[in-house]
C-alpha cells in the first residue's frame, strides 16, 4: 500500500511509517493520554509495527497520531488518536480521521469500532454512532495493566 502524504495548513499528514517517531508517540501516550498512562515503549512499538498508522508532522516533528488495528478486509479498531495541545483546534484530528475514512479499503470494512471518553462529536462526523446492541459485544478489560489505577479505560 502506497503511503499517503497530504500538506494541510502548514502540517504534513502521512501514513508513511518511515516519517513517524515511535519515541514521540510513546512519550505522548505514556504521559498525556488518559487511556494508556505508563505504557511501556516496547508495547507502543509493537502496536505501531502491527497497525495502519497516520501521523501529523510539523517541521518534521511528530505532533499527532492515530492508528487502525485491522485485518484490512472486514474489521478495524481506531485507536490512540491524539494531537499535542499547542496544535489543537486547527482541524488536525479531523483531517487524520477523514484521511483514514476516505481510503477505499476502509470504506469496504464491515465494522469499525473505537472507544472515546470525550471526542464523540469528532467521530460522529464520520458516521460513528453509539452501539445500539451493546449486549452483543463482550470484552476483557484490564485497566491497571500499565500500573496506573486512575485510568478510566
Regions found by a protein language model. Give the residues of each.
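Hydrophobic pocket-lining residues that define ligand/cofactor binding sites across diverse proteins
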Residues: 104
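A conserved beta-strand-loop-helix scaffold within acyl/acetyltransferase catalytic domains
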Residues: 42-59, 63-82
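Conserved acetyl-CoA pyrophosphate-binding loop and the N-cap/start of the following alpha-helix
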Residues: 87-96
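Conserved active-site alpha-helix within GNAT-family acetyltransferase domains
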Residues: 108-142
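Short amphipathic alpha-helix that is part of the acyltransferase structural core
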Residues: 1-39, 149-153
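Short, basic/aromatic-enriched C-terminal tail that caps enzymatic domains
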Residues: 4-10, 131-150
Amino acid at each position: 500500500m502506497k503511503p499517503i502524504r497530504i500538506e494541510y495548513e502548514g502540517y504534513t499528514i502521512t501514513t508513511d511509517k518511515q516519517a513517524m517517531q515511535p519515541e514521540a508517540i510513546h512519550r505522548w501516550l505514556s504521559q498525556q493520554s488518559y487511556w494508556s498512562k505508563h505504557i511501556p515503549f516496547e508495547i507502543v512499538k509493537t502496536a505501531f509495527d502491527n497497525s495502519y498508522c497516520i501521523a501529523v508532522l510539523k517541521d518534521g516533528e511528530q505532533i499527532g497520531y492515530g492508528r487502525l488495528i485491522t485485518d484490512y478486509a472486514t474489521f478495524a479498531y481506531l485507536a490512540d488518536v491524539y494531537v499535542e495541545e499547542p496544535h489543537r483546534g486547527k482541524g488536525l484530528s479531523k483531517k487524520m480521521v477523514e484521511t483514514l475514512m476516505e481510503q477505499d479499503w476502509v470504506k469496504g470494512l464491515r465494522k469499525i469500532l473505537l472507544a472515546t471518553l470525550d471526542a464523540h462529536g469528532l467521530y460522529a462526523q464520520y458516521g460513528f454512532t453509539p452501539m445500539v446492541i451493546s449486549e452483543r459485544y463482550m470484552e476483557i478489560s484490564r485497566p491497571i495493566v500499565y500500573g496506573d489505577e486512575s485510568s478510566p479505560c
